[in-house]
Amino acid sequence: MKYPKEYLNEIKLRLKVSQVVSKSVQLKKRGKEFIGLSPFKNEKSPSFTVNDEKEFYHCFSSGEHGNIFDFLMKTKSIGFGEAVKILAAEAGMQPYRFSYNLRN
């Protein structure tokens, strides 16, 4: 089942990438971006950046890159549907209800 783009966009509108990422990565503001230690690699110098304006994160040490859904899927080892449910709840939205068309 596919989620409608409008539903996913509403989640992204309500939640900043830094808001989601900062629950597992300590971030520091640097200009328009945030930086922190990579959640994907064991590192001593921060190479992980978050850009709320462009709605993505990027890890220069591992090459990982994505949006809030990708981040949850990769850091929590969950599927897309589960990430959508978690983020929708965090955004104060109702879970999406798929409608099924039954054909005779």
What are these regions (language model features)?
Residues 1-100:
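N-terminal structured subdomain of primase-like DNA metabolism proteins
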